[in-house]
């Protein structure tokens, strides 16, 4: 304890004197080691030092009040003038240093320090470190890492991956696939299909159909119809009409007219004649000269002059 206090009071300036005195004692080396450790901030080891230093003054005589050479005045009475040579050869006893006035230890020392503590412990070590921590742990590990993380996880995995992703998903799936695509889509669908195609289109439609066809066309139309037909034709026309008929014919003509009638006949001539020279009604065998006057005779179909009786019959 005395050596400890001396070391604390005088610091490194008294190291030489203190160490010289410690060399006379077998315990000096051990005590020096602990004093040296205490000098660099390990004052909590004071109680340990006190225990180790108790034996240092047991062989001393007196209380060492004079502080000269560690021997009391009564030792002088034991020596006489004839013992000066012996005095020089005598091994000096350990010098007991002065105690502090109050005899109290360092008030800042830790009274709970472990006397068996490791003297080589790092003074800057984390006091809150887990004593059960893995000594082989990675010192560069992420302190914010998930303690419940999968230890078998892929270290090269994408850190931005979706944590809610399907763990059974195809690892060879297309990473550029549309995330909004229809999950029920046909996997055998044509990859070159028109993405703008009508989703309501007839799946049984003719794949060779005209893409420019009229979307408003009659679905019941004749598939064998003439593709060159007049698109402005009368849809109500007679399908049995003569295809060789005169396209310039009078649409208001009498459908019951004589097809053998004179096409050059006067259309303004009255059929109901009132004298000679007029055509007789209901006589298809008669041919009348429309330009003849009343005195002209009516000719028959053979261009013969009729008899008077024949004329009178029709008059």
Curated annotation (Swiss-Prot):
GO terms under cellular component: cytoplasm; plasma membrane; side of membrane
Intervals holding Sequence repeats: 107-110, 111-114, 115-118, 119-122, 123-126, 127-130, 131-134, 135-138, 139-142, 143-146, 147-150, 151-154, 155-158, 159-162, 163-166, 167-170, 171-174, 175-178, 179-182, 183-186, 187-190, 191-194, 195-198, 199-202, 203-206, 207-210, 211-214, 215-218, 219-222, 223-226, 227-230, 231-234, 235-238, 239-242, 243-246, 247-250, 251-254, 255-258, 259-262, 263-266
Entry comment on modification after translation: During host cell invasion, proteolytically cleaved at the cell membrane in the region I by a papain-like cysteine protease of parasite origin. Cleavage is triggered by the sporozoite contact with highly sulfated heparan sulfate proteoglycans (HSPGs) present on the host hepatocyte cell surface. Cleavage exposes the TSP type-1 (TSR) domain and is required for productive invasion of host hepatocytes but not for adhesion to the host cell membrane. Cleavage is dispensable for sporozoite development in the oocyst, motility and for traversal of host and vector cells. O-glycosylated; maybe by POFUT2.
Bias type Basic and acidic residues, positions: 69-89
Keywords on record: Cell membrane, Cytoplasm, Glycoprotein, GPI-anchor, Lipoprotein, Malaria, Membrane, Repeat, Sporozoite
Region (Disordered): 53-315
Function: Essential sporozoite protein. In the mosquito vector, required for sporozoite development in the oocyst, migration through the vector hemolymph and entry into the vector salivary glands. In the vertebrate host, required for sporozoite migration through the host dermis and infection of host hepatocytes. Binds to highly sulfated heparan sulfate proteoglycans (HSPGs) on the surface of host hepatocytes.
Protein family membership: Belongs to the plasmodium circumsporozoite protein family.
Protein name, UniProt field: Circumsporozoite protein
